[in-house]
Swiss-Prot record:
InterPro entries: Aldolase_TIM (IPR013785), ThiamineP_synth_sf (IPR036206), ThiamineP_synth_TenI (IPR022998), TMP_synthase (IPR034291). One of its GO terms (cellular component) is cytoplasm. 2-[(2R,5Z)-2-carboxy-4-methylthiazol-5(2H)-ylidene]ethyl phosphate binds at T132, N133, T134, G162, V182, S183. 4-amino-2-methyl-5-(diphosphooxymethyl)pyrimidine binds at Q36, L37, R38, M39, K40, N68, S106, K135. This is Thiamine-phosphate synthase. Pathway: Cofactor biosynthesis; thiamine diphosphate biosynthesis; thiamine phosphate from 4-amino-2-methyl-5-diphosphomethylpyrimidine and 4-methyl-5-(2-phosphoethyl)-thiazole: step 1/1. It comes from Methanococcus maripaludis (strain C6 / ATCC BAA-1332). The gene is thiE. Belongs to the thiamine-phosphate synthase family.
Length: 207
């Protein structure tokens, strides 16, 4: 299976909603195919401790494992990849240090998309499609903006931002390779059931 095929159901951790290890295990049971560890305010030691546990779980479920922003942590826990924003370490530098990592890059518009593609990103995290409580400073792109980027991007696109069970089909109709979700899964009362339901919706569009 190509890495692109595992981007379809991409879950991002958020300890404000639930414990990373517990929520990830439930999400994986429910069909999540990629996991991203995002711990913006935690110590490096704590990130590595949690990251090692998530690496074990994702390996058991044959899912991809990404670390947000931190190349050192990604390498320490043997992650499959790293996801970076426009202000994080340049993609070219990451490729120089860790050529085997899958690199995802955030993009809000076509300029950021082109910069990421030229830098050597392997996939794009495009959004925020809708307003989101998990990233209050995110700029809203909307479905039209997502469609425009999807049409011209040369690498896989994972849509992100405010995606839930009620709007995910509208997002998938834009031709993306996958959807990234936070609160709709890790903030759910029943994470397993929520993940199973989301997976069924995604499978209508991406086999």
């Amino acid at each position: 299976m190509k890495f692109k095929d595992k981007l379809k159901f991409y879950v991002i951790t958020d300890s404000n909603y639930s414990d990373e290890v517990i929520s990830v295990e439930e999400a994986l049971k429910g069909g999540a195919s990629s996991i991203q560890l995002r711990m913006k305010t935690s110590s490096t030691r704590k990130m590595i401790e949690v990251g090692n546990k998530l690496r074990k779980l994702t390996s058991e479920y044959d899912a991809l494992f990404f670390v947000n922003d931190r190349l050192d942590v990604a390498q320490a826990v043997n992650a499959d990849g790293i996801h970076v924003g426009i202000d994080d370490m340049p993609i070219s530098k990451i490729k120089e240090i860790a050529p085997n990592l899958i690199i995802g890059a955030s993009a809000y518009n076509t300029d950021e998309m082109k910069t990421a593609e030229m830098g050597g990103a392997d996939y794009l995290g495009v959004g925020a499609v809708y307003s989101t409580n998990t990233k209050l400073d995110a700029r809203n792109l909307g479905l039209d903006g997502l469609k425009n980027i999807s049409k011209i991007a040369s690498i896989p696109i994972v849509a992100i931002g405010g995606i839930n069970h009620l709007n995910v089909e509208n997002v998938l109709e834009c031709g993306v390779s996958g959807v990234a979700v936070v609160s709709a899964i890790v903030g759910a009362e029943n994470i397993l059931k929520s993940a199973e339901n989301m997976n069924e919706l995604i499978k209508k569009y991406i086999k």
